[in-house]
A protein has these predicted regions:
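PLP-dependent amino-acid enzyme catalytic core
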Residues: 1-306
Length: 306
């Protein structure tokens, strides 16, 4: 797989990636840095633009989408990216989404023309994945089942773009990489690249602290019924568990004190990053800012200080 753009690709596809690293202000007496990779500045508003572009590119190059719709399960962001990038390339998209996905995410899917299949909210993305598999099994000639949780193009997206960008932007000074984990593609691809460049780098995965949580898109890997096939548990040096309450509080703090409006999963990742610099005053921590808090404005009660 190759991340380089092809001549046939829509101009919108070429706008994905090369997002900035934004500093989070810390105590000036410390030498540590926390740098937020602003993935919400991708054209579709999330890190999943990289994943969707890579999967679409791979499928188109292999002829998988000739006369077929792209089908996948998503908590919202990958589905939005498929729909947006698919619209630019003339690819029709069907997305299975848990019914508790935020109204903003569901609205964006419809605006971009995706067919949306809502699944049981209590079953989360596991249930959405099961429904997508069922749909594909019933009409395999109509759909290409992308299956982002097992598609190698997911990892390739980050190995070929996110990782090299971070390495270049930090001039190799990065000491810790932090990413929230759902499909785990961001950690596997970016972390794998960075580990090859700098074997002593610390890779920190972030997951909810409970199977019942409010962090859309993330998995509690120990209890999920469908562990991502992409996940290599030997790659992260540690996995930090963050509660929904701490993630929410951190996202609110970022909005009010830095102007960075990020979603709940990014709040969880930043909380884990801040824990690192409390213990390691010389660390250079890069954390993935997965998406924008604008995707969750309907959860206004979570944004209000309690």
């Amino acid at each position: 797989m190759n991340a380089e753009p092809r001549g046939w690709e829509p101009a919108l596809w070429r706008a994905v990636g090369n997002t900035p690293l934004l500093p989070i202000a810390l105590d000036a007496s410390r030498g540590a840095q926390v740098l937020l990779k602003a993935e919400w500045l991708n054209p579709g508003g999330s890190v999943k633009d990289r994943t969707a572009r890579s999967i679409l590119r791979d499928a188109l190059c292999r002829g998988e989408l000739a006369g077929r719709r792209l089908l996948d399960a998503s908590s919202g962001n990958t589905g939005i990216a498929y729909a947006m990038l698919g619209a630019a390339a003339g690819v029709e998209v069907t997305i299975c989404v848990p019914a508790n996905a935020s109204p903003e995410r569901r609205a964006l899917l419809e605006i971009y023309g995706a067919e949306v299949v809502l699944t049981d909210r209590l079953e989360g993305t596991d249930g959405a994945t099961e429904r997508a598999r069922q749909i594909f099994g019933e009409e395999p000639d109509r759909y290409y089942f992308a299956d982002q949780y097992s598609n190698p193009a997911n990892i390739a997206a980050h190995r070929e773009t996110t990782g090299p960008e971070i390495w270049s932007q930090t001039a190799g000074r990065i000491t810790h990489f932090v990413a929230a984990m759902g499909t785990t593609g961001t950690m596997m691809g970016t972390g794998g690249f960075l580990k090859e460049k700098k074997p002593d780098i610390r890779l920190i995965g972030v997951q909810p602290d409970s199977p019942l949580h409010g962090l859309e898109g993330l998995k509690h890997l120990a209890t999920t019924g469908h562990p991502p096939a992409l996940y290599n548990p030997g790659l992260p040096d540690a996995v930090a568990e963050v509660s929904t309450e701490v993630a929410d509080r951190t996202a609110r703090w970022l909005a009010r004190h830095t102007g960075y409006l990020v979603g709940w999963s990014a709040g969880a990742a930043v909380a884990a990053a801040l824990d690192i610099v409390r213990e390691e005053p010389d660390a250079c921590v890069v954390v993935i800012g997965c998406d924008s808090g604008a995707r969750y404005l309907s959860d206004l009660h979570r944004w209000r200080v309690t």
